[in-house]
């Protein structure tokens, strides 16, 4: 596995035009048909970019995404070009991209987050308690926080601008945005990818509770998997050995993802008051940063063991 030792909060490539900075990735144009996606070490929680980077995070996210793109290639085409990211920047810029970047096809993005849930957690659990459904999908009575669902469900979200909250939407709303044929294709493909990945992860002692996919259309109109896939930033990763006890106690299972930081941010008090989830975020203490970095490393090590 390639890793970089330097910490990168924000890339600063001058040889390519910057198109956008997302919560984690900086995207640069390479001609008219490709993008260079640089995964920084930034961390976002509650749709706010935190001030402190997590050392090694960008490289780990990139290696994990490449691992899954390779494993899922038979199910769905992806946006990778197969070319080395280092080939499109100057020699001086290589340290900023090595091990943490992907050179990808430029696609027409679909403005829907394709979320699949195999377990009830996070915003899904909150919504279930109010309506016994998630995104309009009715669920059985009596489920608890972190319950395994009878079968995975497709619970899409509207893609938000940076700094805005993604909003859960119904399948019918997806149909309105992309049409019935493409909506059905996205739903079927998302569930198939999730089921394949979740079954594999389980053999490594990891529960993928839920995940978020992003798709685009290529020049031929082919639905193509893009952005990141099945990383701890886009998924809830739970180690199997901590799940049963937490579930029985009605608690969030221990996780390999950002939940650790989310829980700390929920508990922290600023002048005696909870953080209101708007910028600026509270400063993460060094032990939270190091524990978060260790969780990303452990997830990758376990998955690829």
From Swiss-Prot:
Its EC number is 6.3.2.6. It catalyses: 5-amino-1-(5-phospho-D-ribosyl)imidazole-4-carboxylate + L-aspartate + ATP = (2S)-2-[5-amino-1-(5-phospho-beta-D-ribosyl)imidazole-4-carboxamido]succinate + ADP + phosphate + 2 H(+). GO terms for cellular component: cytoplasm. Pfam families: SAICAR_synt. GO terms for molecular function: ATP binding; phosphoribosylaminoimidazolesuccinocarboxamide synthase activity. The keyword 4Fe-4S does not apply. GO terms for biological process: 'de novo' IMP biosynthetic process. CDD domains: SAICAR_synt_Sc. Pathway: Purine metabolism; IMP biosynthesis via de novo pathway; 5-amino-1-(5-phospho-D-ribosyl)imidazole-4-carboxamide from 5-amino-1-(5-phospho-D-ribosyl)imidazole-4-carboxylate: step 1/2. It comes from the Bacteria. InterPro entries: SAICAR_synt/ADE2_N, SAICAR_synth, SAICAR_synthetase_CS. Keywords: ATP-binding, Ligase, Nucleotide-binding, Purine biosynthesis. Belongs to the SAICAR synthetase family. This is Phosphoribosylaminoimidazole-succinocarboxamide synthase.
